Regions:
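Short, hydrophobic/aromatic alpha-helical segments in well-folded domains
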Residues: 126-129, 167
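Hydrophobic secondary-structure block in the mid-to-C-terminal portion of proteins
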Residues: 118-120, 287
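Outer-membrane beta-barrel pore domains
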Residues: 6, 21, 36, 135, ...
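Outer membrane beta-barrel
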Residues: 1-115, 122-124, 131-140, 208-221, ...
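Surface-exposed cleft-lining segments at the edges of enzyme active sites
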Residues: 111-116, 153-157
Length: 292
């Protein structure tokens, strides 16, 4: 067994801790992680942004996975929370001499209030995921679940909790060149004011399908190898499944270019089709990243 720790800060606006955790690695099938880190929910949330094709997360990830949640809890937490998690790999097969896990599990208990915040109620939230590789290298099927609650009013009494439950199913394929990923999320969120008799359950859902294909080429003048991939994503979200005016569909296309091993330029164009709006929305984004 051995220890691994990580401490990551953000000084862009005001100093704050982003990641701060310790891993106790005991065996392939059983490990412990404690501190502040990304919750084990969905494919996209635990992944590094440098591996994703979009500058922004899909709507359903943002709204139901601790980024800009429909219940406004853990907003701007980047899918992170404070807690303890067990994780490991069970069973494996070999492909070209490399051992590939068949089943990966993660199960954690969290405060449920986002990063750099103390617990706001007396309960704890549970998040867990299972990923299965069905014998094909690069192919994974997954499901994850979040069972939690939050304070309807942080200034109110402790027993004014509302449910915040989410369930996901997804699959992805990551080959040498082709990358395809899709997830569906369904959620139940308690909303409203119990004191006024206006408490209700908000049912939300959505899914996305994203794809990209890597091309490699070498610059004749410099001899430097470049990596570039066209990317695209179909992104559908229903904040309230009973109200069609909350439906929105985003169509994204872009280019992911690595002119050097530690330099990345990502450009996205998104066409936003919201039922509540008469006109389409247009968003053009560019992001430059440098790895050290």
């Amino acid at each position: 067994p051995y220890l691994e720790f990580r401490l990551q800060g953000d000084f862009a606006v005001s100093p704050k801790m982003v990641d701060g955790f310790v891993k106790v690695k005991l065996a392939k099938y059983f490990n412990i992680q404690a501190g502040q880190f990304k919750i084990p929910f969905t494919f996209e949330n635990p992944q590094s942004p440098l591996t994703l094709e979009g500058i922004e997360y899909a709507q359903v990830i943002s709204k139901l996975s601790g980024y800009s949640d429909v219940c406004h809890v853990a907003t701007y937490s980047g899918g992170r929370d404070v807690g303890v998690m067990l994780y490991g790999d069970l069973f494996s097969f070999k492909n070209n001499g490399k051992e590939i896990p068949i089943l990966t599990y993660k199960l954690g208990v969290f405060n449920g209030n986002g990063m750099n915040k103390k617990d706001a109620n007396l309960g704890k939230d549970i998040a867990g995921s299972i990923e299965i590789c069905p014998g094909v290298k690069g192919l994974k099927l997954a499901a994850s679940y979040y069972d939690g609650n939050y304070m309807l009013n942080e200034n109110d009494v402790y027993d004014e909790n509302a449910e915040r439950n989410r369930l996901t199913f997804g699959g992805k394929y990551e080959g040498k060149s082709l990358v395809i990923r899709s997830e569906y999320i369904t959620a139940k969120t308690g909303m409203g004011d119990r004191n006024q008799g206006e408490y209700y359950i908000l049912n939300s859902d959505g899914f996305y399908v994203s794809a990209g294909y890597w091309f490699n080429y070498t610059c004749k003048k410099t001899g430097v190898q470049h990596k570039i991939r066209p990317v695209a994503r179909y992104d559908f979200f229903r904040e309230d499944v009973t109200e069609i005016n909350t439906n929105s569909t985003y169509y994204m296309v872009g280019i992911d270019w690595w002119p050097m091993q530690n330099l990345r330029l990502l450009v996205n164009y998104t066409l936003k089709d919201k039922v509540a709006n008469d006109n389409f929305g247009h968003l053009l984004q560019a992001q430059l990243s440098v790895k050290f």
